[in-house]
Amino acid sequence: LSYAAQIATHRGLRNLASLSGTLLSVKSSPELCLALMILEANAICYPDNVYEFPIQPIDLNPDSIITEIRIPIQSVNTSLERVSRTPLDKSIVCSAVALIIQEDNITDIRIAISGISEQPIAIQTIDSSIVNLSISKMKSMIYEAIKDSADHKYSDYLGSAEYRIEIATILTVRAIKKSLSKQ
């Protein structure tokens, strides 16, 4: 979460901005949202309800305000990998991974990716046993899961849909490896 906050914007703007404003801005960097998605955080809004990430500003009451972000206590190893034109540019593709650990065993894996569709998405079809596979099998399974979840029409001058899916796969494998090394 701290790394995501550091790369979301430069120090001057971080000192002025609020987390809720950053999360609701369409043009903001996706790293914070991805970090909160893999940590299964909720946004508490007054006077509305509890929202999961990513928050869709269109769903919010215009009179509501995010009053708190709740992150459940959990034992996780997290990692965030990204590709951008420069270190402070908005990510072209970004992948966040959380390995949930109970009694020294990986019990679940959470993956969230931005840059393969209009909004950041959580990849639901990956099983925690993937960490025990060879790298080539892991990459193949992740590629298929991302391909199934991606918006195949989502492309722009920064990358085609195919490029974004391939990069998301590479970044996700890197993030899993980095999370495993923290164990």
Language model regions located:
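C-terminal structural segment of proteins
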Residues: L1-Q183
